[in-house]
Amino acid sequence: MRRARGRRPPGEFFDVGGHRLHLHCAGRGAPAVVFDAALGASALSWTLVQPEVARVTRACTYDRAGLGWSEAGPLPRTAGRIAGELRQLLHAAGVGPPYVLVGHSFGALVVRIFAARHRGETAGLVLVDPAHPEEWLDPSEDDRRNLDRGVRLCRYGASAARPRVAHVVAALARLGARRPARAIVAAITRGSFDRADENILAPVLKLPMDARRVLTRFWTRPEFFEALGSQIGAVCESASEVRDAERGGPDDLPLTTISATTSSARRLALQEALARSSSRGRHVVAHHSGHWIPLDEPALVVEEILRIVGRRS
């Protein structure tokens, strides 16, 4: 595995059946709070949240296989497979239940499956601008085209990473030069990467500079794009896995959904309904955030996590 240079991995590596995942835990106490990041994000996306939670209890971030500092894992990268690897990782590291599971975007699908499969190990859920399975169980033709485009873009990314084109884009993004970085990405992808600024380049600038350097180096690994492309290509299967795992399950788990102000009306309604599905559910709107709530309003995320932790302390 080629690790990102310039910053030593903050955590440790544990084998989960042929490949090693990076886990970083800080703080002491129970229940342990376990974070799962957005689709192509790493443990670094919790940089502004984890230290504050660690003041109160144990807080653990990790990198899914192929992302961040973790080694590549078997394909396809479905939420169900990832949830199984996460449980293996926690057991290998000696991080015992109960867990408060925190999932951002795609990570919400992973932690919902984990909670449904292991209800007795789960103390609560905090879902941050969560993807919802209903969005992908019956995708429209436009949705399918977008998924196909996402997979295709990841193939371009993997190809660009090998001759070090991605190094140039990463360096420009790290320095805040969005326009030339976006122009290069658009050229590589033949103009189809129309949301590069919002989804990939903008979040980089919300991180401290040292984390920014490491994050952009992650983009220079072909494994990153291969894992991301597999997650995108398998998102409909992941949605089905959530539906099947939760079928007939209990509805009294402490659960908080946090919505972004930029959420579509449909996504907002789904997130509100998800909170109502639990007798101990709660829905919150992050009024000053786009999709990257952990970077825009980390204090709000910390507050909602500790609200659930406090019930179990």
Regions found by a protein language model. Give the residues of each.
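Active-site loop/oxyanion-hole signature of alpha/beta-hydrolase fold enzymes
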Residues: 64-102, 118, 134-146
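Conserved serine/cysteine hydrolase catalytic core
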Residues: 181, 196, 203-285
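Residue in the alpha/beta-hydrolase core beta-strand immediately N-terminal to the catalytic nucleophile
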Residues: 99-100, 123-126
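Gly/Ala-rich beta-loop-alpha elbow adjacent to hydrolase catalytic centers
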Residues: 103-107, 111
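Catalytic active-site module of serine/aspartate enzymes centered on a nucleophile-bearing elbow/loop
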Residues: 278-313
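The conserved beta1-alpha1 loop
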Residues: 34-38, 104, 129
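Conserved HGGG/HGGXW glycine-rich cap/lid loop of the alpha/beta-hydrolase fold
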Residues: 19-69, 109, 117
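Flexible "cap/lid" loop of the alpha/beta hydrolase fold
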Residues: 126-175
